[in-house]
Amino acid sequence: MSAKSAISKEIFAPLDERMLGAVQVKRRTKKKIPFLATGGQGEYLTYICLSVTNKKPTQASITKVKQFEGSTSFVRRSQWMLEQLRQVNGIDPNGDSAEFDLLFENAFDQWVASTASEKCTFFQILHHTCQRYLTDRKPEFINCQSKIMGGNSILHSAADSVTSAVQKASQALNERGERLGRAEEKTEDLKNSAQQFAETAHKLAMKHKC
């Protein structure tokens, strides 16, 4: 089982929540924490997770999850409601940077994702979730690549595929309709020709009868 699957099962499933995405991160600038506050737990892995509740009305949240060295379990740390997210900074709109910042109402963190592609995927999911579940105040996405906001997004590609399929089906139906229309015109012409032939034959028959 992957780390993200384990996080979803251990952290979110018991609370009837569904994890939409996660990104493994490290701080770009380490916070100065007193030794006693760390509890001597040593090194750890950090994940930023995005989840939603299964119950309506749906609530979305961002959670910081940690896995300490030597442990197979995960620990829920800080959590923010999606409404508290104010700004998402992609750092570099022109390149594949793994760095990003998250600004909340009461917190600001500077992160580096494990890979630029993992960050990109998480950003796409985060942007889509904000558009779907936030109606009033949406966070600002700055210094982000265009593929995160639209065009090449993995979330939009599926919609584009569906749209393309619908357009092709519509075109096929239109072409079929045109063919049927032409067939109906030919049928009508044949019908008129048959009527004219019948009338001519009737006139000839009457003429010879006379």
Curated annotation (Swiss-Prot):
Residues of the v-SNARE coiled-coil homology domain: 151-210
Q: Which domain of life is it from?
A: Eukaryota
What CDD domains does the entry give? Answer: PH-STXBP6, R-SNARE_STXBP6
Q: Name one GO molecular function term.
A: cadherin binding involved in cell-cell adhesion
Q: Which residues carry this modification: N-acetylserine?
A: S2
Name the InterPro entries on file: Sec3-PIP2_bind, STXBP6_PH, STXBP6_SNARE, V_SNARE_CC
Question: What is the name listed in the Swiss-Prot or TrEMBL entry for this protein?
Answer: Syntaxin-binding protein 6
Q: Which organism is it from?
A: Homo sapiens
